[in-house]
Amino acid sequence: MNIDLYSDRAKQAVQSAQSLALARGHQQFAPEHILKVLLEEKDGLSRALIQSAGGRPDQLDGGVETLLAKTPRVDGAGGQLYMKPDTARVFAEAEKSAKAAGDAFVTTERLLIAIAKEGGEAAKLFKEAGVSAQSLETAANAMRKGRTADSANAEEGYEALKRYARDLTAAARDGKLDPVIGRDEEIRRTIQVLSRRTKNNPVLIGEPGVGKTAIVEGLALRIVNGDVPESLKDKKLLSLDMGSLIAGAKYRGEFEERLKAVLGEVTAAEGSIILFIDEMHTLVGAGKGDGAMDASNLLKPALARGELHCVGATTLDEYRKHVEKDAALARRFQPVFVSEPTVEDTVSILRGLKEKYEVHHGVRISDSAIVAAATLSNRYIADRFLPDKAIDLVDEASSRVRMQIDSKPEELDEIDRRLVQLKIEREALSKETDAASKQRLENLEVEIDDLQFRSDEMTARWKAEKEKVGGAAQAREALDRLRADLANAQRAGDFARAGQIQYGEIPALERRLAEAEAGDTQALTPEVVDAEQIAAVVSRWTGVPVEKMLEGEREKLLKMEDELRGRVVGQDEALEAVSDAVRRARAGLQDPSKPIGSFLFLGPTGVGKTELTKSLAEFLFADEAAITRMDMSEYMEKHSVSRLIGAPPGYVGYDEGGALTEAIRRRPYQVVLFDEIEKAHPDVFNVLLQVLDDGRLTDGQGRTVDFRNTLIIMTSNLGAEYLASQEDGEDVEAVRPMVMNTVRGHFRPEFLNRIDEIILFKRLSRHNMGDIVRIQLQRVEKLLADRRMALALDAEALNWLADKGYDPVYGARPLKRVIQKELVDPIAKKLLAGEIEDGGVIAVGVTDGQLSFGKAVLQ
């Protein structure tokens, strides 16, 4: 025996067989050890060979196991192993038959045939399993298709298509492919290219998620249904799995050998096989190592001669980046562009897929959910493509409903938790002997009995509902299988079976399903996916509130001005304009191609421009920090525009993205504040033009960022001198022309023309100060509340602070400084000195024109 003459797989089999013999304590290395290892091969090559020769591999395996169990065990033999004469004859026979067939290497199937001929006891097992050496040899020759074993990994090339490709036509025949709706034009164009004499290789090019792979699956379904021209009838469509082709190819040349074997089988099929290569750009450079040839170069000759029918699929970017660079490869393929379907087409696609998802999740999907998935995904999910994003929405919403059905209902869960608490309390009270505890125990018993009754009733109801949903799910699955059987029976011409399914079994199942679905409307858990479930998933993905508004939220929105007035004083016109924009958006009546609203706030310093923006963020998101604030004084240079949208290619920071675009990509629904807008460089306004007009902005990496769900607010002090010079109570509209002249002198007309509303903020009057003092004091009280302390200011103290803090030029900001200096600082000193204790009320009044602090009154 010359081990160098054996292929890698055969060497491995012999070594594993020796290890098996030692592990079982056998002193003799017998043919049955080799047979056992061959039957346990990972890819089952020997088993497949026995099966195709008409044998029973499981019976053979059982016989080998019995034979090995009878072999005497020797413990402590020190790992000595002797070759049985039968084994030597097996190796000699394998080498002889390999030489006779012109093979350079002995392969695993030669060993299998040799065991069947010369294996002694093991050879008898083959006869019992219904297979002879002759039938095995015939099956091996059929599997090899006339090829000789001229390399150490020759087995890798056997039945290469079975190993490295998936039969799409077989999957279509078994009903495993999703139905393909529409896309007739693209499928027709693909068929036209495939029917050419040479260069008959279409490549489907389109954005990710538009349905390129689905078009090929649609072609497979059409081939199975015979809905193709004569030239494509009875063809097989196989999908090449590049992953398994490359996986495990350790040595140089192994990958090329596998690919050559695949191409050889396709060529030998003489045009009856069409190869589909998904993610075609992976071919370019695949397998390329030191001096090795990459996959695309191996394909080119076969493609050019028309021997290889191939359909590729790749995205526009990958095609440009990888395939177009290789002009020789690109010219052998004919591009077929796949565009994104419209919302109407997406609705049709979803209606066709609905049944498959209903069967998988065991829930019902309403038509309103399908329409909502198409429209909401198109509007709110900007960085992905239809129909993929709409299908994902339906899938996730269905999974959510299924999870709710399988989980315990919230109401029942609360009752069960309360029961556990009460039972623990009962155990504790049962040991007490006083009258109060006994009374409490009696009350507990009554409450426990009541809750237990409700829990039992609800549990029984929930389980019954679950069973009903389970029954409906089983009926749907059976219906799906029957429809696939019906299609197969019609194709095979078995019209008796087709009639039985169509007019007997399917109607009976449909009746059963209708009964199961005619459920009670007061179900504990929802069984139907509707538009609201879809909206909830969209909200989770994007943060945009698109669910149906609850009654409380409606009330809140209608009284929005009153809420905001709690923080911003004396600017009613501004509050109204902003509130109207938010209400428009939540009622779904805003222009879908523009931001929720864009405002320019003009007014003197300290009148509440930035404060209104913060209070708006708190009102909408219950979080003052839910705001992207751009201080435009940082964007005074021309080059600072790149900080907003990201650096261009070739510059440092290209991968990081822009400050503005990244913030909106992560959180599409928020308030964007451009503070002190007039301080920015004029080029910054050019960037904002498309944001204000189309609600979108393209960042440095070419990605489109969606601003349609943002509220854009810009603040400025331009023309503030006119507003500041007004008398108390004077209408701001009187000075609007002068203010607008100043604004027009600074901003371009095309920028101003795109802003929804330019709002003038009034100068704060003295009578506004009382409300502002109260708002500012609330913040101080909040800080004191942590120490269980409270403030009590009398009317005189409030007036004193308002007078002292009022400055018509600087607005409310001086008041903040006055409160800090005259109120907070003295309290801080008294706290540190121990004059005020925690848990007291600090009484503040006015004495001799200054604030005075009374002794803390203990609560």
Curated annotation (Swiss-Prot):
It is found in: Cytoplasm. GO terms for molecular function: ATP binding; ATP hydrolysis activity. Residues 391-522 form a coiled coil. Residues 159-340 are annotated as: NBD1. ATP 2 binds at residues 603-610. ATP 1 binds at residues 206-213. Residues 6-71 are annotated as: Repeat 1. InterPro entries: AAA+_ATPase, ATPase_AAA_core, Chaperonin_ClpB, Clp_ATPase_C, Clp_N_dom_sf, Clp_R_dom, ClpA/B, ClpA/B_CS1. It comes from the Bacteria. Residues 3-146 form the Clp R domain. Keywords: ATP-binding, Chaperone, Coiled coil, Cytoplasm, Nucleotide-binding, Repeat, Stress response. Residues 341-543 are annotated as: Linker. One of its GO terms (cellular component) is cytoplasm. Its main location: cytoplasm. Pfam families: AAA, AAA_2, AAA_lid_9, Clp_N, ClpB_D2-small. Residues 764-859 are annotated as: C-terminal. Residues 83-146 are annotated as: Repeat 2. Residues 553-763 are annotated as: NBD2. Homohexamer. The oligomerization is ATP-dependent. The Clp repeat (R) domain probably functions as a substrate-discriminating domain, recruiting aggregated proteins to the ClpB hexamer and/or stabilizing bound proteins. The NBD2 domain is responsible for oligomerization, whereas the NBD1 domain stabilizes the hexamer probably in an ATP-dependent manner. The movement of the coiled-coil domain is essential for ClpB ability to rescue proteins from an aggregated state, probably by pulling apart large aggregated proteins, which are bound between the coiled-coils motifs of adjacent ClpB subunits in the functional hexamer. Part of a stress-induced multi-chaperone system, it is involved in the recovery of the cell from heat-induced damage, in cooperation with DnaK, DnaJ and GrpE. Acts before DnaK, in the processing of protein aggregates. Protein binding stimulates the ATPase activity; ATP hydrolysis unfolds the denatured protein aggregates, which probably helps expose new hydrophobic binding sites on the surface of ClpB-bound aggregates, contributing to the solubilization and refolding of denatured protein aggregates by DnaK. Belongs to the ClpA/ClpB family. This is Chaperone protein ClpB. The lineage of its organism: Bacteria, Pseudomonadati, Pseudomonadota, Alphaproteobacteria, Caulobacterales.
